[in-house]
């Protein structure tokens, strides 16, 4: 297959992956963890998945420790956790 044909195939597949929501059965367990700012004093605006509200919300992360339910962008949070 030519490289052009491969690109034509990969483009729609990549778009499908980005636009397909995560089902609750596919959602990583860490998405259920609460927001955790950690003990440090930084002021990083990040996002976490709130499983009660079924949406990604912003919070202030201190910069260390915390947990895996911590995303730099809302898009990354939605792609990983939102159904």
From Swiss-Prot:
PROSITE patterns: BPTI_KUNITZ_1, BPTI_KUNITZ_2. Its main location: secreted. Expressed by the venom gland. GO terms for molecular function: serine-type endopeptidase inhibitor activity. Disulfide bonds join 31-81, 40-64, 56-77. Serine protease inhibitor. This is Kunitz-type serine protease inhibitor nigrescinin-5. It comes from Cryptophis nigrescens (Eastern small-eyed snake). The lineage of its organism: Eukaryota, Metazoa, Chordata, Craniata, Vertebrata.
């Amino acid at each position: 297959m030519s490289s052009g044909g491969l690109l034509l195939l990969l483009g729609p597949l990549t778009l499908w992956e980005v636009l397909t929501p995560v089902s609750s059965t596919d959602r990583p367990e860490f998405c259920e963890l609460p927001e955790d700012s950690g003990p440090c004093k930084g002021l990083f605006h990040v996002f976490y998945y709130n499983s009660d509200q079924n949406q990604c919300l912003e919070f202030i992360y201190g910069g260390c420790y915390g947990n895996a339910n911590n995303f730099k962008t809302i898009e990354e949070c939605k792609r990983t956790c939102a159904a």
